[in-house]
Each structure stands twice: as C-alpha cells, then as structure tokens.
A protein has these predicted regions:
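Charge-rich, low-complexity N-terminal segments
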Residues: 1-84
C-alpha cells in the first residue's frame, strides 16, 4: 500500500518538470518499473485519480512500463512526461 506515497512523489516530480518546461497541461506520464517494484497499477491509478484534481495533471493518465533491466535498489523511475 505504498502507492499513495509513490503517487505523491510522481506528482511532485511532474509539477516541478511542468514549471521548468512551461507546460500547462500534462496529459501522459510513463513510469518504468522493475520486476521487484511491487507497484500495483490499479492502486496507483486510484490515488492518482484523487490527487490530480486541480493540478496541471488533471487530465493526465499514468502508464506503467515493465523494465526487467531495473535491478537493485532503483526499481522505478519517471520515464516520460507529455504535455503542452
């Protein structure tokens, strides 16, 4: 049940990236996850649906992409933000 904290971190990274790149509307976020990340996509999307309201990510979707090459401590990273 750590998806809430993970979602908050994704949103913090996304907000900072949006400001830095003058993006007003983020519409897609791609997260790469390793085989041992233990991220449940349904729970992550549940938290994201709640937390994104009223932000530059209000219309965004999150996609998880499995990456078997991620090993060790780092089992997840934000791969792509798309917006305008």
């Amino acid at each position: 049940m750590h998806e809430g904290a993970v979602c908050r971190e994704i949103m913090d990274i996304g907000s900072a990236a949006a400001v830095e790149n003058e993006i007003k509307n983020v519409y897609e976020i791609v997260i790469s996850v390793g085989p041992y990340s233990c991220i449940h996509e349904g729970q992550l999307n549940f938290y994201f649906d709640v937390l994104r309201k009223g932000t530059c990510m209000a219309d965004a979707v999150i996609h998880l992409e499995k990456d078997e090459s991620l090993t060790g401590v780092s089992q997840m990273y934000v791969k792509t933000f798309k917006g305008e």
